[in-house]
Curated annotation (Swiss-Prot):
Residues 225-620 are annotated as: Coil 2. GO terms for biological process: heterochromatin formation; nuclear envelope organization; nuclear migration; nuclear pore localization; protein localization to nuclear envelope. This is Intermediate filament protein ifp-1. Residues 453-473, 518-544 are annotated as: Disordered. Residues 208-224 are annotated as: Linker 12. It is found in: Cytoplasm. One of its GO terms (molecular function) is structural constituent of cytoskeleton. Residues 56-69 are annotated as: Linker 1. Residues 1-23 are annotated as: Head. It comes from Caenorhabditis elegans.
Length: 776
C-alpha cells in the first residue's frame, strides 16, 4: 500500500511537470508567432517597395513635391523596418535564452525522474512517448498554420500582380488619367496601411488578453490542484496508519487470547523465544518501512519546495517579459498614432488636389478648348507646395486668363500623334458657320425591342474599369483630330450656360444666320438615372456640369455636306467611385433625313435568322405586342429560348440572349445587379435548397450556394444580388462587385447532384463595342 501511494504521488508530480512543460511549449509557440509576424511584416515591406518602384517608374514628371512626399514616406517606412528588425533580433535572442532554459528544465526533470524511487521504467517510457506525441502534434499544427499563412500571402500576391498588369495597360493615357491612376494607387496603399494598422491592433489586444488570462487563471488552478493532491496524500497516509494500527491491535488480541486458552501447564521457553524473535523481526521490518516512508516524504517535501521556488522564479521572469511586451505595445501604439496622423495629412492633400483639379477642369471647359484635359505638371507642383488656401483664387484667375489666351490662338494635337510617334502643330482661327436646324435622330419603331430594364443601364463587366480611360482618351483624340482636319469648328471662347444634371430637359441649339441662339426643350431619357450623392459630392457635381456643357457644345449641328463628327454620348456610372464618367460604345449616330431608312446590322440579322428554321424565340416590340411564337426545340429534355432585349430607344442598342432550362426552375434574367431565378410551375413549389449558381466570365468563375430548405412558391422568383448592388436585408449575396453582362459570360444553376438545370448566355451585346477589351 505504501509503495502504491508513493507511486500515485510520483505520477501526480509527473503530471504537474508535464503541465509545466506544456506551458513552456505554449510560450515557445507564442515566440514563434511573433517571429512569423515579423516575416509577414517583411513580406508587406517587399510588396510596398514593389508598389513604390512601380509608381516611381510610372510617374514621369518633374514634380519635386511628389518626390518629396515619396522620400518622406520611404524614410518613414525604412525607420519602421529598422525598428522591426531590431525588435526581431531581440525576440530571437530571447527565444534562444528560453530554449536554453527549456533544455535545462528538461534535463533537470529527466534527472529527477531517474532518481525517483518506485517509478517503473515502462511508466517513464509511456510519459516520454506521450510528450513526444504532443510535441509532434504541436509542431504539425504550427506547420499547418504556417502553410495557411503562406497560401494566403501567395493569393494576395497573385491578386496584386493581376492588378498591376491591369494598371500598366492604362499608362498610355494623358495627364488626367495618369493623375487619377496615381490617386487610386495611393488610396489603395493608404487602405492597406489602415488595414495593417487595424490588424496589428487586434493582434496586440489578443496577445495582451491571452497573457493576462494565462497568468491569472492557470496559476491559481495549478496551486489549487497541488494543494488538493497534498491533502489527498496526507489523508491516505492517515487512513493507512489507522488501519494498520487497528489490524495490529486485533492480531495481538487474538494471539494473546490463543496463548491464554491453549497454554499448557508447563511453560516452553523455547517457543516463547521463537515467538519473541518473530515479533522482533516484524517490528524491525515495520520500523524500516516507517523510516523509508519518512525519507520518501522528506524527499517529496524538498521537491515540492524546489518546484515552488522554480515557479516563483518563472513568475518573476514572466512578469518582466510582460512588462517589456507592454512597453513595446505602447511604442507600437505611438507609431500607429503617428502613421494615422500622416495618413490624415495625405488624405487632406488628396482632397486639396482633387478640388484643384476640378477647378482647373472647370476653367478649361469654360475656355472652350475640348483638347485641354488636365493641368500641367508645373500646376500640380505649385498645388503641392502651397501651404494655405489664401492664394488659390488669385492663382486660378491668372491661370484661367493664360489658358484662354493660349487656346484662342493655338491648337496642339499631342494625344493623336502619341501612338505614331509624331507631333503635329496647327493653328485654326476660323469662326463657326451659321447652319440650319437639323432634325434629331428618331428611333425606327419597326426594329425597336423592349425589355423590363432601365432605359439607360450600361452592361457591367469587370473589364469596364480597365477600358474607361481608353474610352475617354479615344473620345478626346477623335474630337481633336476632326477639329484639326476642319470637320469641327473651333468652339467659341465665351462662357456656356450651366445646365444642372437634375433637369429633365436637354437644350438643342440652332444657330440662325444672324447668330441668335434658339433653345428647344426635348425630353431627356437619361434624367431618371441621375447619380446620387457620395463622399465627393462637390467634385462629382462639378464634373457633371462640365461634361454636360461639353456634350451640349458637341451636339450643335454642323454644315450640310460636311463630315459629321463621331460623337459618343457620355454617361455617368453610379457604381464607380467619385462618379467616374465612362463612354458607352454605342453605334455612331448620324442624321436621318425624311423618307430615308437607315439599315443596321441587327435588321439584317433578324431577317436572316427568320429564314434559318424553326426555333423558340420571343421578340417584344416597342408597342407591347408579342410576335407569333414558333415551334420549340428540345435539347436534353429542356427548352432553349432565344430573345432580345432593349436598353434604350435606339434600334441598334439591344441585347440578345439564349437561355435553357430543364425542370421547374430557370434563370429568367441576368443584370449587373442581380440574377433572377423563377419557378415556372403555376401549381407546384420548387425546392432549390443546396443549389449552386455559377457565374463564369473570362477565365474566372464565381459560385453561390443557395440556403438549404429554400423553396420557391408557384410563379415565385428569387434574386441573387451582387455585392455592390442595393438589396434588402437577408438577401442572397454573391462574392462579386457586379455581374458581367457581356457575351463572354455564362450563368448556370446546378442541383445537389451537380446536374445543370438552367443556363443563361448573352449572344450579342452592342453596348460593349470593341471586343479587344475582354481579351487577357
Amino acid at each position: 500500500m505504501d509503495s502504491a501511494n508513493a507511486r500515485d504521488c510520483l505520477l501526480h508530480l509527473a503530471r504537474a511537470k508535464l503541465s509545466e512543460r506544456q506551458d513552456l511549449v505554449q510560450l515557445n509557440d507564442q515566440f514563434v508567432d511573433i517571429i512569423e509576424h515579423v516575416h509577414y511584416m517583411e513580406a508587406e515591406h517587399t510588396a510596398l517597395e514593389h508598389d513604390y518602384n512601380l509608381l516611381k517608374s510610372g510617374v514621369q514628371s518633374d514634380s519635386s513635391g511628389i518626390n518629396e512626399i515619396y522620400n518622406v514616406e520611404i524614410r518613414t517606412v525604412r525607420s519602421g523596418i529598422e525598428e522591426i528588425n531590431r525588435s526581431r533580433h531581440e525576440l530571437l535572442n530571447e527565444q534562444t535564452q528560453l530554449s536554453h532554459q527549456v533544455k535545462e528544465a528538461e534535463q533537470l526533470w529527466r534527472h529527477t525522474a531517474k532518481s525517483a524511487l518506485g517509478v517503473p521504467k515502462e511508466v517513464d517510457d509511456e510519459f516520454h512517448r506521450i510528450c513526444h506525441i504532443k510535441m509532434e502534434d504541436c509542431i504539425t499544427k504550427r506547420r499547418i498554420k504556417y502553410m495557411e499563412d503562406k497560401l494566403r500571402l501567395i493569393k494576395q500576391n497573385n491578386g496584386r500582380i493581376f492588378e498591376h498588369i491591369n494598371l500598366m495597360r492604362m499608362r498610355k493615357d494623358q495627364a488626367v488619367s495618369l493623375q487619377q491612376e496615381y490617386l487610386l494607387r495611393k488610396n489603395e496603399l493608404l487602405h492597406s496601411i489602415r488595414n495593417m494598422e487595424e490588424d496589428n491592433k487586434k493582434i496586440i489586444m489578443n496577445e495582451h488578453k491571452y497573457f493576462v488570462r494565462d497568468r491569472n487563471a492557470d496559476r491559481h488552478v495549478f496551486r489549487d490542484q497541488l494543494r488538493k493532491a497534498i491533502a489527498d496524500i496526507r489523508a491516505d497516509y492517515e487512513a493507512n496508519r489507522l488501519r494498520n494500527e487497528e489490524e495490529i491491535r486485533i492480531r495481538l488480541e487474538r494471539e494473546i487470547h490463543r496463548m491464554n486458552t491453549t497454554m499448557p501447564g508447563v511453560v516452553c521457553y523455547d517457543k516463547l523465544r521463537e515467538e519473541l524473535s518473530i515479533v522482533k523481526n516484524n517490528l524491525s521490518g515495520l520500523q524500516k518501512q516507517v523510516s523509508e516512508v519518512e525519507i520518501r516524504n522528506n524527499s517529496l517535501t524538498q521537491q515540492i519546495e524546489f518546484y515552488r521556488l522554480e515557479i516563483s522564479e518563472n513568475n518573476k521572469l514572466f512578469e518582466d517579459t510582460l512588462e517589456f511586451k507592454i512597453k513595446e505595445i505602447e511604442k507600437m501604439r505611438e507609431q500607429c498614432t503617428a502613421i494615422s496622423v500622416e495618413l490624415e495629412k495625405l488624405c487632406d492633400l488628396n482632397i486639396d488636389l482633387q478640388k484643384e483639379i476640378a477647378k482647373y477642369r472647370e476653367l478649361l471647359d469654360r475656355s472652350g478648348d475640348p483638347r485641354a484635359n488636365a493641368p500641367s505638371t508645373q500646376v500640380i507642383a505649385s498645388a503641392l507646395s502651397r501651404q494655405n488656401y489664401s492664394s488659390i483664387s488669385d492663382h486660378h484667375s491668372r491661370t484661367s486668363s493664360g489658358i484662354v489666351q493660349h487656346t484662342a490662338h493655338h491648337a496642339v494635337r499631342d494625344s493623336s500623334s502619341s501612338r505614331t510617334g509624331t507631333t503635329i502643330h496647327e493653328t485654326i482661327t476660323h469662326t463657326p458657320i451659321p447652319i440650319p436646324a437639323t432634325l434629331p435622330v428618331q428611333p425606327i419603331r419597326e426594329y425597336t425591342y423592349s425589355r423590363d430594364a432601365s432605359p439607360i443601364r450600361p452592361s457591367y463587366t469587370p473589364y469596364q474599369q480597365e477600358s474607361r480611360a481608353d474610352s475617354r482618351s479615344s473620345l478626346r483624340e477623335r474630337i481633336q483630330i476632326e477639329t484639326l482636319q476642319g470637320t469641327l469648328p473651333v468652339l467659341p471662347s465665351h462662357s456656356v450656360e450651366t445646365i444642372r444634371a437634375s433637369d429633365n430637359t436637354r437644350l438643342v441649339r440652332d444657330l440662325s444666320a444672324g447668330g441668335q441662339i434658339n433653345t428647344t426643350q426635348i425630353n431627356n431619357p437619361y434624367a431618371s438615372r441621375t447619380p446620387t450623392s457620395s463622399v465627393n459630392d462637390r467634385i462629382a457635381s462639378e464634373r457633371r456640369d462640365s461634361e454636360i456643357r461639353r456634350n451640349d457644345a458637341l451636339h450643335q449641328p454642323y454644315p450640310i455636306g460636311g463630315a459629321v463628327p463621331r460623337v459618343e454620348p457620355t454617361i455617368f456610372n453610379e457604381r464607380a467611385p467619385g462618379y467616374t464618367h465612362i463612354n458607352s460604345n454605342f453605334p455612331l449616330i448620324t442624321p436621318v433625313t425624311e423618307g430615308a431608312t437607315v439599315p443596321s446590322y441587327y435588321d439584317t440579322f433578324n431577317r436572316n435568322s427568320s429564314q434559318r428554321g424553326p426555333h423558340h424565340s420571343s421578340y417584344h416590340a416597342a408597342t407591347g405586342s408579342v410576335s407569333n411564337s414558333i415551334s420549340t426545340t428540345l435539347l436534353n429534355e429542356g427548352s432553349i429560348e432565344h430573345s432580345s432585349s432593349s436598353d434604350s430607344v435606339d434600334e441598334d442598342n439591344f441585347q440578345r440572349f439564349t437561355r435553357w432550362y430543364k425542370g421547374r426552375v430557370k434563370i429568367s434574367d441576368v443584370t449587373a445587379d442581380f440574377v433572377q431565378l423563377v419557378n415556372r410551375s403555376s401549381k407546384k413549389s420548387a425546392d432549390v435548397g443546396g443549389f449552386k449558381l455559377i457565374h463564369e466570365f473570362g477565365n474566372k468563375s464565381v459560385y453561390v450556394d443557395l440556403p438549404v430548405g429554400l423553396i420557391l412558391a408557384p410563379k415565385d422568383s428569387l434574386k441573387i444580388y451582387a455585392r455592390g448592388a442595393t438589396h434588402e436585408r437577408g438577401a442572397v449575396i454573391a462574392e462579386i462587385d457586379f455581374f458581367d453582362t457581356t457575351i463572354h459570360t455564362n450563368t448556370s444553376i446546378r442541383n445537389t447532384n451537380n446536374e445543370v438545370k438552367s443556363w443563361f448566355v448573352y449572344t450579342s451585346n452592342t453596348e460593349i463595342g470593341d471586343a479587344d477589351h475582354h481579351h487577357h
